[in-house]
Curated annotation (Swiss-Prot):
Belongs to the class-II aminoacyl-tRNA synthetase family. It comes from the Bacteria. Zn(2+) binds at residues 337, 388, 518. GO terms for molecular function: ATP binding; metal ion binding; threonine-tRNA ligase activity; tRNA binding. It comes from Parabacteroides distasonis (strain ATCC 8503 / DSM 20701 / CIP 104284 / JCM 5825 / NCTC 11152). Homodimer. This is Threonine--tRNA ligase. SUPFAM superfamilies: Class II aaRS ABD-related (SSF52954), Class II aaRS and biotin synthetases (SSF55681), TGS-like (SSF81271), ThrRS/AlaRS common domain (SSF55186).
Length: 651
């Protein structure tokens, strides 16, 4: 008999070789219908795989991320099987599950797969679902795998196999389709009741622009059709909120192929928005004694060799800048941290000087393949709201608490009320790859866990997910339509202090290494603005929006009165513009609603005679007529209320 421990710490005994499906059936028939895969000692398994030793088991359902992953991984195989039947001779690359659905990279040869073919592919997938094909795992030798896929002319698969270590290789088979795969997978195809092919795109094999461009098909599946319908409705809403579309409508930013792909340019309104965000963060950081610094946009190659960034980014970075006189090489800055390490090193440091908190809105450049570029969320030049804290090991917990406060203030002020966190710690067993002493790691890991507990923050702990140089805490927010975005990171670093030989003199008069903490509440200004646009659909908080008021005269003869109002509001620090185009008032209202301006003031003969304005509020319509001073007090009162909420959350 073997002992199975469940997440609630209850224990049951089963015969050796019992499968996770049999365990589910022993608990309830409903659970057996809902379970998709199982976590066995932290590793996700197929439900049919025998468990031969005592184990900790969690039965995974749709609600679990690992359950969805297995579901969508099996869906990728289902789509591949359908493609194999529809396009004889098609060759397969890779087909992983992703955050929302799955994709498969395929080489259809002379055939062309286009959007008009999606319905036929979906129909074939549902035909295979109805067959309830069993998904079978098989362990074979590397030689057998090479022969199997080689005989089929699967050149992409044989390339992958050739790079694997000698030993057992896993394949999965359903119907006539067999794939090289680690798994896990569902028991059979009948689980995949609702299918949808979403899009088709090009993708270079293994992300290498010098290799062949394959066809990438994206899809998504659900256990129920109702869930698919809800998702497709969500997709339509997401299209309306696309930051690229709204950013263009609101004149926030632009791109130009003449300037260069992936290089955003901020227009006046977008710049005003961005600067206001930066000032907001500066005000918060000032309370926590951050000192702002400014560093050059390039650095000597030797700096990045020392930091290790040259090894990571050098090969794929932009071309170096050569100085003919000195014969030196300079690179566009990929990270701010090496420069901050040199600032720390500029002066002798005592334990009394720590923590030292250096902040910078630093622009960095990293090469991204053109196919990976996407609006503001994936660019080649971006500005990080970066800060690096140099502290003693005993100060790590308090610094985490402080940064968590800052991130919480940012999220609440921007109305990201729904967020979660993940703690990434060392692997429980394999610890050779981590730099730094066990003692310091244990202190840092304990400090992060305790900080989350003190703040009442429910954080998921992931062992083995820490970087080799330190544990970290990541924050994920849910936007207004339920999508998850990773925003805000706090990362402990034992690597750079070692590489740069950073020191401080301790109370014992001996030299010690400081702990370095990286943090960025926004992540990058570009990505944060993109997420904020899609979260708010461009309807920013009143204090933040670039233009708070648009004054619209109903005819040219009231233009002077409109500009007089704009000046009066400007004197009270209200951001107002005048739309004095020779257009009908209905057209002006529609155009400015598209620009998401919170308030519109309509002025005509009646308003001019009474020194009033007719007020319309975005999303609420007509608010009636009022004196200019009354309106100004109303607007400033709204802003003050928002700022008071921020102030309370900061106290």
């Amino acid at each position: 008999m073997i002992k199975i421990t469940f997440p609630d710490n209850s224990v049951r005994e089963y015969a050796k070789g019992t499968t996770a499906m049999q365990i589910a059936e022993s608990i309830s028939s409903r659970l057996a219908q809902e379970v998709l895969a199982a976590s066995v000692n932290g590793e996700v398994w197929d439900l049919s795989r025998p468990i031969n030793d005592d184990a900790t088991v969690k039965l995974l359902k749709w609600e679990d991320e690992e359950g969805k992953h297995a579901f969508w991984h099996s869906s990728a195989h289902l789509m591949a099987e359908a493609l194999q039947e529809l396009y004889p001779g098609i060759k397969f690359g890779i087909g992983p599950a992703i955050e929302n659905g799955f994709y498969y990279d395929v080489d259809p040869g002379e055939a062309v797969i286009k959007e008009g073919d999606f319905a036929a592919i979906e129909a074939k997938m549902l035909e295979l679902v109805a067959k309830k094909e069993e998904i079978k795992r098989q362990d074979i030798t590397k030689a057998d795998a090479m022969k199997m896929f080689g005989d089929r002319g699967e050149e992409y698969k044989t390339e992958l196999i050739s790079e694997l270590e000698d030993g057992t290789i896993t394949t999965y088979t359903q119907g006539s389709f067999t794939d090289l795969c680690r798994g896990p997978h569902l028991p059979n195809t009948s689980y995949l009741k609702a299918v949808k092919i979403l899009s088709v795109a090009g993708a270079y094999w293994r992300g290498d622009e010098k290799r062949k461009q394959l066809v990438r098909l994206y899809g998504i599946t659900f256990p129920k059709k109702k869930m698919l319908d809800e998702y497709l409705t969500l997709l339509e809403e997401a299209k309306k909120r696309d930051h690229r579309k709204i950013g263009k409508e609101m004149d926030l930013f632009m791109f130009s192929d003449t300037v260069g792909k992936g290089l955003p340019m901020w227009l006046p309104k977008g710049t005003a928005l961005r600067l206001r965000l930066q000032e907001f963060l500066r005000r918060i950081q000032a309370r926590y004694n951050y000192q702002e610094v400014m560093c050059p946009p390039i650095g000597n190659k030797l700096l990045y060799i020392t930091s290790g960034h040259y090894a990571k980014y050098g090969k794929d970075s932009f071309q170096p800048i050569h100085t003919p006189e000195e014969g030196e090489e300079y690179f566009l800055k990929p990270m701010n941290c090496p420069h901050h390490c040199m600032i720390y090193k500029n002066s002798p440091r005592s334990y009394k000087d720590l923590p030292l908190r250096l902040a910078e809105f630093g622009t960095v450049c990293r090469y991204e393949q053109s196919g990976e570029l996407h609006g503001l969320t994936r660019v080649r030049s971006f500005t990080q709201d970066d800060a690096h804290i140099f502290c003693r090991p005993d100060q790590v917990k308090q610094e985490f608490l402080n940064v968590m406060d800052i991130i919480s203030i940012v999220f609440k002020t921007m109305n990201f009320e729904n967020f979660e966190a993940q703690i990434s710690l060392r692997d429980k067993v394999n610890r050779e790859k981590y730099i730094g002493s066990d003692e310091n790691w244990e202190k840092a890991e304990q400090a992060i866990v305790e900080a989350c507990e003190e703040k009442g923050l429910k954080a998921k702990i992931e062992y083995g997910e820490a970087a080799f140089y330190g544990p970290k805490l990541d924050f994920m927010v849910k936007d207004a339509i339920g999508r998850r975005w990773q925003l805000g990171t706090i990362q402990v670093d034992y690597n750079l202090p070692e590489r740069f030989q950073l020191e401080y003199t301790g109370a014992d008069n001996q030299k010690h290494r400081p702990v370095m903490i990286h943090r960025a509440p926004f992540g990058s200004m570009e990505r944060f603005v993109a997420v904020l646009i899609e979260h708010t659909a461009g309807k920013f908080p009143l204090w933040l929006t670039p233009e708070q008021v648009c004054i619209m005269p109903i005819s040219e003869k009231f233009n002077d009165y409109a500009w007089q109002i704009a000046r009066e509001l400007g004197n009270q620090e209200i951001r107002a513009i005048v739309d004095d185009r020779n257009e009908k008032i209905g057209r002006k209202i529609r155009d400015n609603e598209l620009k998401r301006i919170p308030y519109m003031l309509i002025v005509g003969e009646k308003e001019a005679e009474n020194s009033e304005v007719s007020v319309r509020k975005q999303g609420e319509g007509d608010k009636g007529s009022m004196k200019i001073a009354t309106f100004a007090a109303l607007l400033n009162g709204e802003v003050e209320e928002m700022m008071n909420r921020w102030q309370k959350s900061n106290d």
